[in-house]
Design a protein with these regions (language model features):
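Glycine/acidic-rich beta-strand-loop module
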Residues: 46-81
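Pseudouridine synthases involved in rRNA/tRNA modification
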Residues: 1-13, 19-25, 159-247
Length: 247
């Protein structure tokens, strides 16, 4: 019996709502990890499912697992080919003047004895791309929808701090770390097309620490939010805005 919230399940795939604080791999210094709990997720199948991608320890939300080696290979390929649709929600430690945009940065890994390792923008790094937009503002903080096209390590965290100019609330590496209960990032939804099968689709509910800060209880799906924004524009101006025409 598992206490994980199962968001999607079929013969080859499983999507769980990963809780914050749960590492994918067992940390060197020990502690809770998904790796230690994979047996709970067999759910009657012979093999333990294996994660097809990664989420940071603090990040909550949609995590896809494969139930057999062939499925894992196909899922890994789908992520590499960038055909997996991913939407994240993050709370910024401030409100940006610009409300939406596209961030394109090359990222590289550095390390030091004092600060450990981190990702930084660097010309010699690997390209990374994220579309973003503010969807709510509460008490001097912004709830932002992130749509990453690439999947670099710490991509959204670096893009918030260096691309938007405001780090995620609670981020100990790219922000001050003391402003929130954790790095406030949530993998809201995931969609993976499959040949000869229905797509894998899942949406994770808004976590309690997001709603405690005034964001929630659950956001509208991204498509509904976009339609709502267009409708508001028509009401206010008598026609669609220039930004909407570009979408």
């Amino acid at each position: 019996m598992s206490d994980f919230n199962i968001l999607f399940e079929d013969g080859e795939a499983l999507v769980i709502d990963k809780p914050t604080g749960l590492s994918i791999d067992t940390p060197r210094k020990g502690g809770p990890s998904l790796e230690k709990r994979l047996d709970e997720l067999r759910l009657g199948f012979q093999r333990q499912p294996q994660p097809a991608h990664r989420l940071d320890t603090d990040t909550s939300g949609c995590l896809l697992l494969a139930r057999n080696p062939k499925a894992l290979k196909r899922f890994n390929m789908a992520f590499e080919q960038r055909i997996v649709g991913k939407v994240y929600l993050g709370i910024l430690a401030g409100i940006p003047e610009v409300k939406e945009g596209r961030i394109e940065l090359s990222l590289s890994k550095i390390s030091s004895a004092e600060k450990g390792w981190r990702m930084i923008p660097a010309r010699a790094g690997k390209p990374s791309v994220t579309d973003w937009r503010v969807i709510a503002e509460v008490n001097g903080r912004a709830l932002v929808e992130f749509r990453p096209e690439t999947g670099r390590t710490h991509q959204i965290r670096v893009h918030a701090a260096s691309g938007i100019g405001i780090p995620l609330l609670g981020d100990p590496v790219y922000g001050d770390g003391a402003s929130g209960p954790r790095t406030m990032l949530h993998a809201l939804s995931l969609e993976m097309p499959r040949e000869n099968k229905a797509a894998i689709t899942a949406t994770a509910p808004m976590p309690a620490d997001f709603t405690a800060l005034g964001f929630g209880p659950a956001p509208l799906p991204a498509e509904a939010l976009a339609a709502e924004a267009r409708a508001d524009s028509v009401i206010q101006t008598g026609g669609p805005s220039a930004i909407d025409d570009q979408d």
